[in-house]
């Protein structure tokens, strides 16, 4: 089986290094195509009509000066040019959970979606952290992913119910793992929570006049009232697997308007 690894945290991120270690020896070919820098929250942006500089680190490794979706598509194109597209794309391992309202913003899930859009089975993997971003390089932040991810990927590949019919998003807890649960993503209250301080505002005076610079803090999903949602189950210590499809339709509202026609 030929597999492509990608992410949104960047080619040289710790999560990519962990993912490489996890899949080592389990696939016939492993390719890597990932952004040159951290592209967290880049969502599904593609660099349309813009040349995308790509450095080759090896015959099967590409550092892409573009978005996560760019990286996935370029990796698939490179693999296809050798005679066969990948059998699987794995995006991650993201540093931080992707649950609830963070899902549409996630570059990790977007890279998987770019693969899924062109017919390649895709899995996105995210590792919850304990609230301190500086723990990125601490091995304990990744131990649950190291222990659990490959077994779960193998399970999905054997599962005829999935067979690449949707994106599979896996969130791994920071705390002791209580088991594996399948769940939808939480979207209870209609609003995103920005943990404070939500942004840092700086005024800058330069040669071209007065400017304002903003730096957004991490975005997290609000606490869900649904105990069976991805956010709640992750907080309870479960590895959460969420099937994600194409549709963004609000069917409840659509049904009401269709009833008036």
From Swiss-Prot:
Manner of cofactor binding, per the entry note: Binds 1 divalent metal cation per subunit.
GO MF annotation: an example: 5'-nucleotidase activity
Major enzyme class: hydrolase
Name of the gene this protein is made from: surE
InterPro entries membership: SurE, SurE-like_Pase/nucleotidase, SurE-like_sf
Organism: Anaplasma marginale (strain Florida)
Keywords: Cytoplasm, Hydrolase, Metal-binding, Nucleotide-binding
Protein name (database record): 5'-nucleotidase SurE
Similarity remark: Belongs to the SurE nucleotidase family.
Predominant cellular place of this UniProt entry's protein: cytoplasm
Binding site for a divalent metal cation: 8-9, 40, 94
